[in-house]
Amino acid sequence: MFPRLSQLETRTIAEILRTETAGGAVLIVAAVLAMVWANSPWAQSYGTVTGFVPWPGGEPVGLDLNIRHWASDGLLAVFFFVVGLELKREFVAGDLRNPQRAAVPIVAAVSGMAVPAVVYTAINLHAGADALRGWAIPVATDIAFALAVLAVIGSHLPSALRAFLLTLAVVDDLLAIAVIAVFYTESVNVVALLSALLPIAAFALLVQLRKTWWWALLPLALATWGLVHASGVHATIAGVLLAFTVPVLQRRGRPGLAERLEHVWRPVSAGVAVPLFALFVAGVSLRGGAVAAALADPVAIGVVAGLVLGKLVGVFGATFAMAKFTRATLDEDLSWLDVAGLALLTGIGFTVALLVGDLAFGSGSERGEHVTFAVLAASFLAACLASVVLCARNAAHKRVRGPH
């Protein structure tokens, strides 16, 4: 029924998955499947599968995790490894190494994280300390999801818009990683954390020597992940730490190792890790008054307002202020309506938002379910609003430039 793919077919699928657009499309499909499954006659099986513990004997080493936790702690480590490679490449050899070019997207990213956090906090100020733990949920943008929407509606939009979104998202990812590491680590096992430096150092030595021995690198990566997990720091940070050791610059005319590893692992991240995370985390029941309960929760209201309103005000406001009060100028191909559409697009928060929701309120909790619903609703609303603005701008650019 499912014949084995040829080498050419395998390569073709991998190339497709290397594009953010395809990754976003697969992510959307996985999220929809999760929602359908969680609200189908087989909804009970969804809870059974996500709550299943594959290795009950792993309790002594803290690895008696259920499927949902393996998805958020394990699979997302691959996603953060790819993000880390991209971050280092951008800072060493990309746009972010030029302070003048990087200034506007960096300020826009910082403001686009700060304003949603303020909006969320203002709404939940009197909802109790527990509610305030979710302040970081609306701060991050899901770049794969956002680029998938942009690709569908923006065939004639200037390339500068996509480049700005990509650069902003890189900074956004870096700050989101810092937020998770600093604010969502409750206690640290110093011995385990220091022990993680040993496999990291060995991994760094091999990659600096350009030795891509998978039989050595993979066990070192797994050891790093296990020790970081045991330390109390979220295990996905292990992926970032390992990525930062990989050299970026070329040698003897060959692409840098960071680029080559990103080329290998991006399809795994986009086609397997992130979609499975979405499948096992995004399923939330909409039956029996669940929607009404979520809409009455200030946490859910704060998440929606932060993503949709906070991102728009933060990104657009910072970009406008930079153009108004500094020497920075808007690209000649762009208008402020283009920037407004892009700012709305950054309100699509998914992967990191769901992860932070789990860290803040616990996976499977009632409030955690409200957060999942809010993230999905806000992302859908932001995508719709951005589509309205950018479709109009796409038509305008098409008239100016012609159909080609």
From Swiss-Prot:
Pfam families per the UniProt record, alphabetical: Na_H_antiport_1
Gene3D superfamilies (alphabetical): Na+/H+ antiporter like domain (1.20.1530.10)
Keyword Flavoprotein belongs to the record: no
Bilayer-spanning residue ranges: 22-42, 67-87, 103-123, 134-154, 163-183, 187-207, 213-233, 276-296, 298-318, 336-356, 371-391
MF GO annotations: sodium:proton antiporter activity
Substrates-to-products reaction catalysed: Na(+)(in) + 2 H(+)(out) = Na(+)(out) + 2 H(+)(in)
Location of this chain's protein in the cell: Cell membrane
Alphabetized UniProt keyword annotations: Antiport, Cell membrane, Ion transport, Membrane, Sodium, Sodium transport, Transmembrane, Transmembrane helix, Transport
One CC-aspect GO term: plasma membrane
GO BP, one annotated term: regulation of pH
InterPro entries in alphabetical order: Na/H_antiporter_dom_sf, NhaA
UniProt membrane topology term: Multi-pass membrane protein
Family, similarity comment: Belongs to the NhaA Na(+)/H(+) (TC 2.A.33) antiporter family.
NCBIfam families: NhaA
General function of this protein: Na(+)/H(+) antiporter that extrudes sodium in exchange for external protons.
Protein name per UniProt: Na(+)/H(+) antiporter NhaA 2
The species this protein was found in: Saccharopolyspora erythraea (strain ATCC 11635 / DSM 40517 / JCM 4748 / NBRC 13426 / NCIMB 8594 / NRRL 2338)
